[in-house]
């Protein structure tokens, strides 16, 4: 579907409403920075607090701005299989290139339940599906063996966003899924694990950091894929302070503060999320300056 960097893009708000003017600026910044895909309405896009009408407007606006240059992937995960399918169908109708489906959260399905969830949805859409494994938020972990079973059996499930963070699991997930199906893709769901996942044979990252540093994150992957491993490692090391700073509070609180400092969006979130503390804002100012982004 894509190799390299897919930006998990924020959803800008202003006075409680979608700020589509700011959103267009941010999308064009991503395109200029060379990212390979946009992921709309994921965790970073505050999907749980965006209503169905807003979802439609945001996805439509994204497709309009991108105009086929890169894939547009829409977050469509819930903890109800039927509700998830409804969001998938909305994305399909709007013309999205694919959907990112987080594992059902709170109700904690078994590995068999996870498999059946993705099987049910994949049989009812022609869209490309990406599994999103983020056990720190969902309470459920897609084991490498389950990911490999999905890869083997469900042909329109094209890859997994692996945000487990465990290096051993990353390695096993890459190894088992690609043994099951050579074109199955694995993206890091943690910016600070991107280089390690690439070394394990993965395909890139679905990134928060690329909201503020699209070119740098794109360069990291491009250098690696070109065989310039040491150059990629150097970029990774330079990005480490930014990677760390953007997660000192719950995502997307710091990244919205950073984008506000850079002049792209208002520093506005929807409850239950609140803006970054003054301490975090000061930290971000320093890191952004050191990174040449402010």
UniProtKB/Swiss-Prot annotation:
EC number: 4.3.3.7
Disulphide connectivity of cysteines: none
Catalytic activity: L-aspartate 4-semialdehyde + pyruvate = (2S,4S)-4-hydroxy-2,3,4,5-tetrahydrodipicolinate + H2O + H(+)
Group of enzyme by EC: lyase
InterPro entries attached to this UniProt entry: Aldolase_TIM (IPR013785), DapA (IPR005263), DapA-like (IPR002220), Schiff_base-form_aldolases_AS (IPR020625), Schiff_base-form_aldolases_CS (IPR020624)
GO cellular component, one term: cytosol
Keywords, in A-Z order: Amino-acid biosynthesis, Cytoplasm, Diaminopimelate biosynthesis, Lyase, Lysine biosynthesis, Schiff base
Residues noted as binding pyruvate in the record, renumbered to the chain: 44, 206
GO molecular function, one term: 4-hydroxy-tetrahydrodipicolinate synthase activity
One Pfam family recorded for the sequence: DHDPS
Pathway terms, separated by semicolons: Amino-acid biosynthesis; L-lysine biosynthesis via DAP pathway; (S)-tetrahydrodipicolinate from L-aspartate: step 3/4
GO biological-process terms attached to the record: diaminopimelate biosynthetic process; lysine biosynthetic process via diaminopimelate
Site annotation Part of a proton relay during catalysis: residues: 43, 106
Protein location: Cytoplasm
Catalytic residues identified in the record: 132, 161
HAMAP family: DapA
Function: Catalyzes the condensation of (S)-aspartate-beta-semialdehyde [(S)-ASA] and pyruvate to 4-hydroxy-tetrahydrodipicolinate (HTPA).
Stated family: Belongs to the DapA family.
Subunit field text: Homotetramer; dimer of dimers.
Record's protein name: 4-hydroxy-tetrahydrodipicolinate synthase
């Amino acid at each position: 579907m894509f190799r390299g960097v897919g930006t998990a893009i924020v959803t800008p708000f202003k006075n409680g409403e979608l700020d589509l003017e700011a959103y267009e600026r941010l999308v064009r910044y991503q395109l200029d920075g060379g990212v390979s895909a946009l992921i709309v309405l994921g965790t970073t896009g505050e999907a749980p607090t965006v209503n169905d009408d807003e979802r439609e407007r945001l996805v439509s606006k994204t497709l309009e701005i991108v105009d086929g240059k890169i894939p547009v992937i829409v977050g469509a995960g819930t903890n109800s299989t039927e509700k998830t399918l409804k969001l998938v169908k909305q994305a399909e109708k709007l013309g999205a290139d694919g959907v990112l489906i987080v594992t059902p959260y709170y109700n904690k399905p078994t590995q068999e339940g996870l498999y059946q969830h993705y099987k049910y949805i994949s049989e009812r859409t022609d869209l490309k599906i990406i599994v999103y494994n983020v056990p720190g938020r969902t309470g459920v972990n897609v084991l490498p063996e389950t990911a490999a079973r999905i890869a083997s059996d469900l042909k329109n499930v094209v890859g997994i966003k692996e945000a487990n963070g465990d290096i051993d699991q990353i390695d096993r997930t890459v190894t088992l899924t690609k043994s099951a199906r050579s074109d199955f893709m694995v993206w890091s769901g943690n910016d600070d694990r991107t280089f390690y996942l690439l070394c394990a044979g993965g395909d890139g990252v679905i990134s928060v950091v690329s909201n503020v540093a699209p070119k740098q994150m794109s360069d990291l992957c491009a250098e690696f894929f070109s065989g310039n491993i040491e150059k990629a490692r150097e970029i990774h090391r330079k990005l480490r302070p930014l990677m760390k700073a953007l997660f000192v509070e719950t995502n997307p609180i710091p990244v919205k503060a950073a984008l506000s400092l850079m002049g792209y969006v208002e520093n506005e979130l929807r409850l239950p999320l609140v803006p970054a503390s003054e301490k975090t804002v000061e930290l971000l100012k320093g890191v952004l300056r050191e990174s040449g982004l402010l």
